[in-house]
């Protein structure tokens, strides 16, 4: 029974990886919308874009690691 609950928890934590992908898409879409409105400011904002993508992707990686820990360590 405890093993089954670990797999359910791992599945729920694994959904965080997909949600992080949605977050990365949202960051990129908003950057593109802003860059199309003001092309002269787009070049100075690319570093901010990459930082935002890195933070969103880091949350996905952390949720993936939690899922792996729940599956194999618990």
Swiss-Prot record:
Keywords: ATP synthesis, Cell inner membrane, Cell membrane, CF(0), Hydrogen ion transport, Ion transport, Lipid-binding, Membrane, Transmembrane, Transmembrane helix, Transport. The record marks 57 as: Reversibly protonated during proton transport. GO terms for molecular function: lipid binding; proton-transporting ATP synthase activity, rotational mechanism. It comes from the Bacteria. It is found in: Cell inner membrane. Disulfide bonds: none annotated. One of its GO terms (cellular component) is proton-transporting two-sector ATPase complex, proton-transporting domain. Belongs to the ATPase C chain family. This is ATP synthase subunit c. The gene is atpE.
